[in-house]
Amino acid sequence: MQSRPAQESGSASETPARGRPTPSDAPRDEPTNYNNNAESLLEQRLTRLIEKLNAEKHNSNLRNVAFEIGRPSLEPTSAMRRNPANPYGRFSIDELFKMKVGVVSNNMATTEQMAKIASDIAGLGVPTEHVASVILQMVIMCACVSSSAFLDPEGSIEFENGAVPVDSIAAIMKKHAGLRKVCRLYAPIVWNSMLVRNQPPADWQAMGFQYNTRFAAFDTFDYVTNQAAIQPVEGIIRRPTSAEVIAHNAHKQLALDRSNRNERLGSLETEYTGGVQGAEIVRNHRYANNG
């Protein structure tokens, strides 16, 4: 009879124990989640570190750094800002650099003249895609023969599925600009063409040029470095040497003297000329002392 209260008390003491979580009832995945998150963060840091190190790798080492193009432009103060309406305003270097100035030479064919020449050549029946090639072949030929206004050329210029007389191309150029002006416009192109083919003007020896100056034996040699002329894509292969410049200028002076012997006469009437050519212009270079 006394054992029942003992059972009741024992069951009463067991009831609150069920409400308390025992160590075995605690969630077991919390340490696992923490470890996974820590591992993921470490992997992210490792990935970012590798990416940063890869971005810093390079195979160049810049030295003597100096940039002008693309640098931030400065804004001058109000006292130094130029008034565009004042012709005496002082231009800054930045303003001069940004100013678009075309390089012009009055001794070459202009764009308008070249447009007329191209139009007339196309009017002969030359396909438009071959007009530039025909012009270039003409000026290369003139480097071997002459670009004189008195030139009477022979032969024809060929292109794909056709040909055109040289006389026709020369006449068109002489009519609109002058043959020599067109040749001056293409002087750098002709210079590169001769050098890359190792093909100097054909008459260089007959003109008195030495072997080391043979590439200077054409009329428009003195326009090879002119920036107003049409430039090759890569630039000229090499600049003319001093020996080539001296040889060209000497020959040019002799040629001008020979052709200008009648320019000394005030009139070409027989009363002045006596029916003969003017006296030869003589220049004695034997006594030139440049040493």
UniProtKB/Swiss-Prot annotation:
Localization: Virion
Primary location: virion
Keyword hit for Ribonucleoprotein: yes
Biased composition (Polar residues): 1-14
InterPro entries: Carlavirus_coat_N, Pltvir_coat
GO terms for cellular component: helical viral capsid; ribonucleoprotein complex
Keyword set, alphabetical order: Capsid protein, Helical capsid protein, Ribonucleoprotein, Virion
Top-rank taxon, per record: Viruses
Region ranges (Disordered): 1-36
Residue spans crossing the bilayer: none
GO molecular function: structural molecule activity
Family membership: Belongs to the potexviruses coat protein family.
Purpose of the protein: Required for genome encapsidation. Forms ribonucleoprotein complexes along with TGB1 helicase and viral RNA.
Protein's recorded name: Capsid protein
